[in-house]
């Protein structure tokens, strides 16, 4: 096998069109085109998302290849997100990958979006030394659609040992932010306001779920009932207390996440712990990871902010590991909206 492997990654699972190029584990480019159109609707509109992907995919891929400083003929394989995600959005990336694969005569690599988030911890930028978790390690994957504790034995062997049984942590942030009138996406807004508030100002329900599983529906309901009762007494309650509400909400979510992760790490005698997914951009959660590193002797790994949300660099490095295994996919591969780790 040649020494350097160049992989083009394509990500189109939701509302971000992204393309990236990696040489082995080193990122050469990572281009992302977002879709501001969804803010007016308070959430992602699937039809609008797929149309925007069709408009963005060609210029985004072209720009990624240009920034990487390579010719398209140097690409060894194309990695694309097969799922989970919005089917219409996934179809755009999958179809483009097929066309480019046929035109260049190179293989395709189908990537699980959740695997890719985990493997974002293995990305490095030019000039950086490789610093990534040793196997086995635990990864807390938190996003708008997923809250999972994953036991990672290798890039090809991952097991979900705990997951949400209802709402995801990111979904709880978004929905609670929406009822406060804070806008979409709610997670970053809650994070910003939380830094200005008192995390002990309000107490919300904490679930009692067996094992390492999570539940956030009770917390969400408790939050809504608190607002209902307080607004009945004072119509300006949210405006007067939004920083404290956000701080208390964020503190509760993080406490729920970390309690289960602590138990999983203890039970599996693991000290290598990673964070991944869109909610990993939350500064409070990052601080909690560093605090646990000091208190419990963990070695923690947290992706740079650029690799926390959906991006093609994580797809490309996931594809790189598949390339090493010779795990190529047929040209008739189809995307799936729902697949697990």
From Swiss-Prot:
Its main location: cytoplasm. SUPFAM superfamilies: Actin-like ATPase domain. The keyword tRNA processing applies. The keyword Iron applies. GO terms for cellular component: cytoplasm. It is found in: Cytoplasm. Required for the formation of a threonylcarbamoyl group on adenosine at position 37 (t(6)A37) in tRNAs that read codons beginning with adenine. Is involved in the transfer of the threonylcarbamoyl moiety of threonylcarbamoyl-AMP (TC-AMP) to the N6 group of A37, together with TsaE and TsaB. TsaD likely plays a direct catalytic role in this reaction. This is tRNA N6-adenosine threonylcarbamoyltransferase. It comes from Porphyromonas gingivalis (strain ATCC BAA-308 / W83).
């Amino acid at each position: 096998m040649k020494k350097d492997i160049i992989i083009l990654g394509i990500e189109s699972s939701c509302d971000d069109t992204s393309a990236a190029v990696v040489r082995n584990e080193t990122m050469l480019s990572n281009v992302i085109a977002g879709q501001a159109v969804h803010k007016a609707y308070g959430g992602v509109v699937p039809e609008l998302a797929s149309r925007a992907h069709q408009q963005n995919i060609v210029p985004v891929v072209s720009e990624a290849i240009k920034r990487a400083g390579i010719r398209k003929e140097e690409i060894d394989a194309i990695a694309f997100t097969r799922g989970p995600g919005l089917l219409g959005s996934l179809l755009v990336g999958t179809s483009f990958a097929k066309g480019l694969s046929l035109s260049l005569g190179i293989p395709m690599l189908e990537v699980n979006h959740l695997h890719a988030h985990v493997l974002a911890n293995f990305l490095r930028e030019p000039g950086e030394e490789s610093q990534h978790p040793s196997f086995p390690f635990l990864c807390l994957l938190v996003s708008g659609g997923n809250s999972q504790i994953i036991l990672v034995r290798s890039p090809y062997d991952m097991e979900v040992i705990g997951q949400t049984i209802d709402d995801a942590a990111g979904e709880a942030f978004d929905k609670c932010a929406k009822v406060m009138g804070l806008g979409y996406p709610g997670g970053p807004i809650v994070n910003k306001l939380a830094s200005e508030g008192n995390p002990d100002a309000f107490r919300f329900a904490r679930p009692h779920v067996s094992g390492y599983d999570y539940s956030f529906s009770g917390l969400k309901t408790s939050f809504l009932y608190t607002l209902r009762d307080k607004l009945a007494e004072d119509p300006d309650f949210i405006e007067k207390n939004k920083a404290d509400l956000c701080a208390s909400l964020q503190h509760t979510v993080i406490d729920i996440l970390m309690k289960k992760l602590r138990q999983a790490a203890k039970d599996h005698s693991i000290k290598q712990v990673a964070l991944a997914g869109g909610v990993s951009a939350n500064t409070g959660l990052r601080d909690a990871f560093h605090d646990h590193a000091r208190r419990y002797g963990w070695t923690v790994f947290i992706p740079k902010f650029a690799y926390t949300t959906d991006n093609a660099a994580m797809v490309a490095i996931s594809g790189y590991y598949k390339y090493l295994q010779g795990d190529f996919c047929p040209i008739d591969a189809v995307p799936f909206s729902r697949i697990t780790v």
